[in-house]
UniProtKB/Swiss-Prot annotation:
GO CC annotation: mitochondrion
Domain of life: Eukaryota
The protein's role, per its UniProt record: Core subunit of the mitochondrial membrane respiratory chain NADH dehydrogenase (Complex I) that is believed to belong to the minimal assembly required for catalysis. Complex I functions in the transfer of electrons from NADH to the respiratory chain. The immediate electron acceptor for the enzyme is believed to be ubiquinone. Component of the iron-sulfur (IP) fragment of the enzyme. Component of the iron-sulfur (IP) fragment of the enzyme.
Enzyme class: translocase
MF-aspect GO terms: NAD binding; NADH dehydrogenase (ubiquinone) activity; quinone binding
Annotated NCBIfam families: PRK06075.1
Protein name: NADH-ubiquinone oxidoreductase 49 kDa subunit
Keywords (A to Z) from UniProt: Electron transport, Mitochondrion, NAD, Oxidoreductase, Respiratory chain, Translocase, Transport, Ubiquinone
């Protein structure tokens, strides 16, 4: 049979963005694949070199625009490492941990729902998007924006709108989300058609993970026990002091990756509940006034006063801080976080000015996309949509 070449995307609904694949097919079996990326390139890393450190923060929301706050966290950790002000126990770190896990649920809900929709199950997308809408509302309540939050800041988060009512609502969301997860388990996990479409499809080995630099769910599905949140040396935020577990698979196939994502959402709910308990029972209350008082003692934090607009000198100081930003002495650092897709890292090089000399982003989805030709070889064209869904790619962070 003569091999034929087919374009898959970039307009295909299962391409999850602007992905263009040139496929060589033998009948309906994929023999070769050529991936074309770069259709969403905006030069984000170069633009960061032209802005003060704080003003580069919103660029990270626009990389992987499904897991926004986790990427802000990586950038904040990089700046804090350069300033030598890394903190693991403060209240604002607990708030970051809580919103990181809310973001993880946000990402996995979309990944699983769209994956199911690609294969033909419509029910789960309605349940998942209802839960995502609630998380978007929490985003909006703390920072005014639903997607591009710009909520985290070096050595602090915007605590002005954090309230006991918000924490109560998040706890209520946790209970409802567990019900939704059990409904999704019932309709997908034990579904015969779903298992036939995923089991032994797109299997990868331990060696493939090392060769292609796979991290996160992709690596854990093969049995690699690597989770930055639980790593004794690479841990960050408040995860070291929390009680949770990380899940691994054995087969390295699409079904294992689906199960890991489902279980991770349950663990995220557990972590959020622990973070809220710590916030509400700690000696330092969670009121913005008391936290601002503690923050003002730090050297690299904006001095926030009630009367900063009543004094000329304080107004000038306030204006200079937010327009010029702080200067960081020459140094470099690499800081990574466990994003929903894998290890999201930021390499930051400072040269003594108020702008980064270089900011390099390590996006996990870029590495995961490279393994797609090997995963899809020998599979049917119909399985390709299942494979693209299971590697969970977003082109904002691939093309940057």
């Amino acid at each position: 049979m003569k091999a034929i070449c087919v374009n898959f995307g970039p307009q295909h609904p299962a391409a999850h963005g602007v992905l263009r694949l040139i496929l060589q097919l033998n009948g309906e079996v994929v023999e070769k694949m050529d991936i074309h990326i770069g259709l969403l390139h905006r030069g984000s890393e170069k633009l960061m070199e032209t802005k003060p450190y704080l003003q580069s923060m919103p660029y990270f929301d626009r990389l992987d625009y499904v897991s926004m706050m986790v990427q802000e966290h990586a950038y904040c950790l990089a700046i804090e490492a350069l300033l030598n002000t890394t903190n693991y126990t403060a209240n604002f770190v607990l708030v970051r941990t809580m919103f990181d896990e809310l973001t993880r649920i946000l990402n996995h809900m979309l990944a699983i729902a769209c994956h199911a929709l690609d294969i033909g199950s419509m029910s789960s997308i309605f349940w998942a998007f209802e839960e995502r809408e609630k998380i978007m509302e929490f985003y909006e309540r703390v920072c005014g924006r639903r997607m591009h939050a710009a909520f985290y800041r070096p050595n602090e988060v915007n605590l002005n709108f954090l309230s006991v009512k918000l924490l109560t609502d998040i706890l209520e969301f946790n209970n409802n989300c567990l019900t939704t997860l059990s409904e999704m388990h019932n309709i997908l996990t034990y579904n015969k058609i779903w298992k036939q479409r995923l089991v032994n499809i797109g299997s990868i080995s331990y060696k493939d993970c090392l060769d292609f630099g796979l991290t996160g769910v992709m690596a854990r599905s093969t049995g690699i026990k690597r989770d930055l949140r639980m790593d004794a040396f690479d841990t960050y935020a408040n995860y070291y002091y929390l009680n949770f577990r990380s899940y691994t698979g054995q087969a390295g196939d699409s079904y294992d990756r689906f199960l890991i994502r489902m279980n991770e959402m349950s663990e995220s709910i557990n972590i959020i509940s622990q973070a809220i308990f710590k916030l509400t029972t700690s000696k330092n209350t969670c009121s913005p006034a008391s936290i601002l008082k503690a923050l003002n003692k730090k050297k690299f934090i904006s001095q926030t006063y009630k009367n900063e607009y009543s004094s000329m000198e304080k107004l000038i100081t306030h204006f200079k801080y937010w327009s010029e930003g702080f200067k960081i002495q020459s140094n470099w650092t690499y800081q990574a976080v466990e994003s929903p897709k894998g290890e999201f890292g930021v390499t930051l090089v400072s040269d003594g000015s108020n702008k980064p000399y270089r900011c390099k982003v390590r996006s996990p989805a870029y590495h995961h996309l490279q393994v797609l030709p090997k995963m899809s070889k020998g599979h049917l064209l119909a399985d390709l949509s299942a494979l693209i869904g299971t590697i969970d790619i977003v082109f904002g962070e691939i093309d940057r």
